[in-house]
Amino acid sequence: MEEGVNMDIRPTRIELIRTRRRIRLAKKGLDLLKMKRSALIYEFLQISRTIRGMKENLRKEVVEALNIIKVASVLEGSLALERIANMSSDSRINVNSRNVMGVNIPTLEVSYNLSILSDVYRTVSVPVAIDDSIRRFQKLFYDLILIVEKENSLRNLLMEIDRTKRRSNAIENILIPRLEYQAKMIKMTLDERERDTFTTLKTIKKKIEAEND
């Protein structure tokens, strides 16, 4: 007897029909889970490739931003840089989410409070070299947030891929074999009853024929 098989099921034709229906539904569910897992893996690989490209660009941006701020320091002096840095705008990160195949993917939005370093103020009062540095580092910060967002997405996708795999394995290796075994046992019992009934009827028929003779 297979482990986990429910032998309390009544061996009737209705139960056989129900069990076979459950097998079909389980197989359909398994196909859907496999399709979902494939879609999640595809999304995972796409985001992974995107992150690799973003990190390569980020390294270049860091080098460029550092070079630009060095130039600004030489042209305008370190004191001017510190004065502008102390006036820097505050930034806020808003966390939202989107749904991909049932997985919540975090989305991060960066907003800046430009009440001090407004575009107008920067155009009039901030030297071009320092203003260029500000823009570069703002973009650097924004790109870094995007990478963090996508890495969090990868983490969530990976967990869902693992959950989907476990569910698929449970259906494929436990549920379906158990249902198929139950259907087999019910069918064997029904066939045996049918043979017994046929044998009994045949015996009765012979007795009736013998009595008539």
UniProtKB/Swiss-Prot annotation:
GO-annotated molecular function: ATP binding; proton-transporting ATP synthase activity, rotational mechanism; proton-transporting ATPase activity, rotational mechanism
Annotated organism of origin: Thermoplasma acidophilum (strain ATCC 25905 / DSM 1728 / JCM 9062 / NBRC 15155 / AMRC-C165)
The protein's name: A-type ATP synthase subunit D
Function: Component of the A-type ATP synthase that produces ATP from ADP in the presence of a proton gradient across the membrane.
Lineage of the organism: Archaea, Methanobacteriati, Thermoplasmatota, Thermoplasmata, Thermoplasmatales
Keyword field contains Glycoprotein: no
Domain of life (superkingdom): Archaea
One GO CC annotation: plasma membrane
Gene Ontology BP, a term: proton motive force-driven plasma membrane ATP synthesis
InterPro entries: V_ATPase_D
Assembly description: Has multiple subunits with at least A(3), B(3), C, D, E, F, H, I and proteolipid K(x).
Keywords assigned by UniProt, alphabetized: ATP synthesis, Cell membrane, Hydrogen ion transport, Ion transport, Membrane, Transport
Chief localization: membrane
HAMAP family, A to Z: ATP_synth_D_arch (MF_00271)
